[in-house]
Amino acid sequence: SNTRNFVLRDEEGNEHGVFTGKQPRQAALKAANRGDGTKSNPDVIRLRERGTKKVHVFKAWKEMVEAPKNRPDWMPEKISKPFVKKEKIEKIE
């Protein structure tokens, strides 16, 4: 399996939380679902790929959307859907 680990960093470079995904975007979506960003005021998510000096920077937010018609019983009618938009890649020295 080629799952990659992405570590969530804050502005100070402290790292908390690992999100997995085959692509940085996948990990960013998982992180976005935990944040409080909105479309007008998105969170900034910085994910460093484990074992590299690359930090993927995303803008992230959630929107309430209608759940799919064939949703399981436990799923509410409205669900929050994460969105991410890649901003840039930073290199750590």
UniProtKB/Swiss-Prot annotation:
Top-rank lineage group of the source organism: Archaea
Keywords (A to Z) from UniProt: DNA-binding
Keyword Transmembrane among record annotations: no
Database matches in SUPFAM superfamilies: Chromosomal protein MC1
Stretches for region Disordered: 1-43
UniProt record, GO biological process: DNA protection
Stored Gene3D superfamilies: Chromosomal protein MC1
Entry annotated with the keyword 4Fe-4S: no
Pfam families: MC1
GO molecular function: DNA binding
Functional description taken from the UniProt entry: Protects DNA against thermal denaturation and modulates transcription.
Name of the protein this chain belongs to: Chromosomal protein MC1
UniProt organism field: Methanosarcina barkeri
